[in-house]
Amino acid sequence: MFPFGQKGQKIKGTMVVMQKNVLDINSITSVGGIVDQGLGFIGSAVDALTFAATKISIQLISATKADGGKGKIGKSTNLRGKITLPTLGAGEQAYDVNFEWDSDFGIPGAFYIKNFMQNEFYLKSLILEDIPNHGTIHFVCNSWVYNSKNYKTDRIFFANNTYLPSETPAPLLKYREEELKNVRGDGTGERKEWDRIYDYDVYNDLGNPDSGDKYARPVLGGSALPYPRRERTGRGKTRKDPNSEKPSDFVYLPRDEAFGHLKSSDFLAYGIKSVSQDVLPVLTDAFDGNILSLEFDNFAEVHKLYEGGVTLPTNFLSKIAPIPVIKEIFRTDGEQFLKYPPPKVMQVDKSAWMTDEEFARETIAGLNPNVIKIIEEFPLSSKLDTQAYGDHTCIIAKEHLEPNLGGLTVEQAIQNKKLFILDHHDYLIPYLRKINANTTKTYATRTIFFLKDDGTLTPLAIELSKPHPQGEEYGPVSEVYVPASEGVEAYIWLLAKAYVVVNDACYHQIISHWLSTHAIVEPFVIATNRQLSVVHPIYKLLFPHYRDTMNINSLARKALVNADGIIEKTFLWGRYSMEMSAVIYKDWVFTDQALPNDLVKRGVAVKDPSAPHGVRLLIEDYPYASDGLEIWDAIKSWVQEYVSFYYKSDEELQKDPELQAWWKELVEVGHGDLKDKPWWQKMQTREELVEASAILIWIASALHAAVNFGQYPYGGLILNRPTISRRFMPEKGSPEYDALAKNPEKEFLKTITGKKETLIDLTVIEILSRHASDEFYLGQRDGGDYWTSDAGPLEAFKRFGKKLEEIEKKLIEKNKDETLRNRYGPAKMPYTLLYPSSEEGLTFRGIPNSISI
């Protein structure tokens, strides 16, 4: 029975959709665009119009009038004609739809939609106009809608109003609760492509024991190896290990987490998959068949990668997927060769990487700028168990340091807060013997830096330690190296720095990048979708910072961090990479991820209420920290204003069942292996919510930008950021030492990442360092001003955007100040990674909202 009284009035609606084949990878012609195919649901515009009109039905749901305790449901109506709108984006189509209305129905607050077509389509939005006594209502949908038979309950979408649970209009409350229940699922069964279910699982999908022991990997999470949780797929288990999940070509994601928009990063991500499945095997064949030489002979040959390129086998391109980003990297120009763009670190000065100043500068303005710590004791001690590992007290002595302390003693330098350390020792020692049992050969490293009067850092000494040949309990075998600038000793010192950088490169990729951003954020994505309604204010605050994260993480588990994947092949830690990240996760602290807390914990800043950001930097010219504090403050101010708009008291927050369930599940399940840690916020005050939300947004946006988009600009020159070491340091009197004296460049290259691994590494990090054409950056949102109907948050968000623009101008001015030497360095590459905005491509700047690549 039609629930309306008078049927005379109409509500006009406009629905915007995208068809499935818009996101077909074969229709993409470049990293930025699509082929115009006269896009319609099934081909021609006429077909699309008739088809859509009869196959998609919609029912409005009242937010103000109830029927049986739930909002009244209107009569089903179909899409009508296709219309043209000036606001339509690429591949988008608009249709009009009319709804009958009377005053007994009230104001619409949601709608049901059914798709009776064979194919799914992407629903962008619905706008209802001229609603009596109300005006216009916006529904921002951004969701795939499959044939209705694939769903147990009808698909529902809510208007862009924002409500705490206690403020939800009574007719919508049950719909709100039911929709949350739908996306939680029941924890059983294998997930299907059209599912929208968010649930948790451990990392039991990295290996494939059925293919042999070489491919078996331990389960991470819920065991002695703690780990954040990932999305559950429900796939079956392997034959050999009932705890490991069977590999599959299809990796389930809740449908709207994958390809939910025309985004070239989807294809950047597919590029990574192509490197793993196509490029890697073909390159391996080329090297194994001696078509390509195994080693670089000198630094000039490395430079040729960017100037002339490497000639490829004649059939190379026919064997790799026709993915635009891959085509772009394997530039043919009529010939089959591999040529990379010159990385920024060598664009001005090809040998800047060899200087001590650049080596030191990159600890505070490079790829891994959040590891360096202050030295507060001397000699440096170890936290390793002495019974198991012997005495690991650092053997760097005063005699190694004081000649270069500018007249200070070590004690005075420590007192004046002038000594810093890059410490890659304790976490590596338990795995070092296993790592060195393969073709890789390396050391645990400790590097001491001195803060000079001109504000720059300089390395004073490097300790290289390897396991004692008679056993771990005897302690390490260690040597100390100090700077040298002439003869063979200059190359010994260059090698010592290379061992440090190899450790730093591994720690960066697997800990600072993968673990501390990608893996850490995934449980937040899952918990937010399971426990916070789409109309909850905190859902709307955090949602933009999750875009594409689960998608890129699932691809990473399949091609990057999986057993025998790209990371294991091209980074020193090899098969132990993910296991080591689990060991390091044990000591991860959520509250320390707030930038001011991180800086204070590492001793590179001290709390100072009179300082602009509440902390004073001890290395005043610390580009990552000084720029980051500007961004951190802007994020926190925006979050503070937003939270205060919706929660007028701590009591309101305490009584919010969705918020409390969200935080409880995040801590106890999502990061459940650390649930008993005392540092978790209790989520009893608005201040705790502001801090937790700001930390999450910081991790997903600025922290990820700082450790990701410099990968190619710094690491694209393998000489600057080697990822593997293959030989130990040559000892005096040995043939290797003599060879180093005669041909230092060749011997250096024999020690670091080999040619095959270099080509794979560069191909991947060039993709990872790119921005997509339709990326959303911090201070921007998809949907323009329609993500909420509340004017207060909309105005606050605009102020946030303006603040970020001001910060960017300030950072640009800073980079013009030549007295700030750490911003520029010998490589003459200003620190731009925390500029909020960017164009598409390889830009060395820009803070996307989310971890999208």
From Swiss-Prot:
Residues 228-250 have a biased composition (Basic and acidic residues). InterPro entries: LipOase (IPR000907), LipOase_C (IPR013819), LipOase_C_sf (IPR036226), LipOase_CS (IPR020834), LipOase_Fe_BS (IPR020833), LipOase_plant (IPR001246), Lipoxy_PLAT/LH2 (IPR042057), Lipoxygenase_dom_3 (IPR027433). It catalyses: (9Z,12Z)-octadecadienoate + O2 = (9S)-hydroperoxy-(10E,12Z)-octadecadienoate. It is found in: Cytoplasm. Binds 1 Fe cation per subunit. Iron is tightly bound. Found in maturing and developing seeds. In young seedlings it is found in cotyledons, hypocotyls, roots and primary leaves. GO terms for cellular component: cytoplasm. GO terms for biological process: fatty acid biosynthetic process; lipid oxidation; oxylipin biosynthetic process. Its cofactor is Fe cation. Induction: By pod removal and methyl jasmonate. Signal peptide: none annotated. Pathway: Lipid metabolism; oxylipin biosynthesis. Keywords: Cytoplasm, Dioxygenase, Fatty acid biosynthesis, Fatty acid metabolism, Iron, Lipid biosynthesis, Lipid metabolism, Metal-binding, Oxidoreductase, Oxylipin biosynthesis. Residues 34-159 form the PLAT domain. One of its GO terms (molecular function) is metal ion binding. Residues 213-250 are annotated as: Disordered. It comes from the Eukaryota. Coiled coil: none annotated. It is an enzyme of class 1 (oxidoreductase). Its main location: cytoplasm. Belongs to the lipoxygenase family. This is Linoleate 9S-lipoxygenase-4. The lineage of its organism: Eukaryota, Viridiplantae, Streptophyta, Embryophyta, Tracheophyta. The gene is LOX1.5.
